[in-house]
Amino acid sequence: MVPSQSHPAKTPRKQLKPPIEAVQSHYDRSNEFFKLWLDPSMTYSCAYFERPDLTLEEAQRAKRDLALSKLGLEPGMTLLDIGCGWGSTMLHAIEKYDVNVIGLTLSANQLAHNKLKFAEIDHTRTDRTKDVRLQGWEQFDEPVDRIISLGAFEHFADGAGDAGFERYDSFFKMCYDVLPDDGRMLLHTIIVPDAKETKELGLTTPMSLLRFIKFILTEIFPGGRLPKISQVDHYSSNAGFTVERYHRIGSHYVPTLNAWAAALEAHKDEAIALQGRQIYDTYMHYLTGCSDLFRDRYTDVCQFTLVK
């Protein structure tokens, strides 16, 4: 919630409202629909193709390995996953690092999916706590040891113009406050180039690009905002974080999106039966168009390793 000009004081974090309707309009389309074109782990963010011959499932596991390896996880720690999706990162962390997990999601379908997955875990092999909540970061205030957020930050800003990004201030302060003195956080988000990089890349803004951006913000991710690296730097440092590493992996989103589009096309009849022809066409346009954006470097992905 952005304060009005007549009331410049910042809104207290717990009075900020999570974008529940906007998030559910996309992620609650139906689990069955997403299963048609995501990999078996249901990971819905840029994969990491360490080698070009990896399958999408292998590349998604490599991405989770990459992200989790930057956190310094130890057995018994508690990992907070903000925007946990369908839970693949939490399950990976439990399996590989023997940690407790808390997942936050605004999707009712993802909540139900994660509860089922947690119930399937062999409790004779681990007694770690596994908690998933229908809750935004705005209401979270419990101590944790590490934080990860993959492909959710794009939903955290609000409104148009620079004022909409001020929610980042509250987000990073919450993260800083719940972490211990040696706390670490991995933030994986789509980014856009600043003016200098845009010029260096020779990027232009044709009408076709503007139409596609409007399509994405209207039909796919209403309310979505993409940050620049400088904005992550600014708001995270305001909270007290230092960026230990910037790791740009946007080139890997091209094969990720291409794999998703190919899988959706291969399941065209099933997708139409589930959601109708219009939704099928909309998602094909979204996936193929976004692949072009990453190919041409209008968008990128950066993993920020943040330390206290």
From Swiss-Prot:
Catalytic activity: a 1-acyl-2-(9Z)-enoyl-sn-glycero-3-phospholipid + S-adenosyl-L-methionine = a 1-acyl-2-(9-cyclopronane)-acyl-sn-glycero-3-phospholipid + S-adenosyl-L-homocysteine + H(+)
UniProt keywords, alphabetically: Cytoplasm, Lipid biosynthesis, Lipid metabolism, Methyltransferase, S-adenosyl-L-methionine, Transferase
Domain of life: Bacteria
Pathway: Lipid metabolism; mycolic acid biosynthesis
Subcellular location: Cytoplasm
SUPFAM superfamilies per the UniProt record, alphabetical: S-adenosyl-L-methionine-dependent methyltransferases
Record: active site: C290
Protein name according to UniProt: Cyclopropane mycolic acid synthase 2
Organism: Mycobacterium leprae (strain TN)
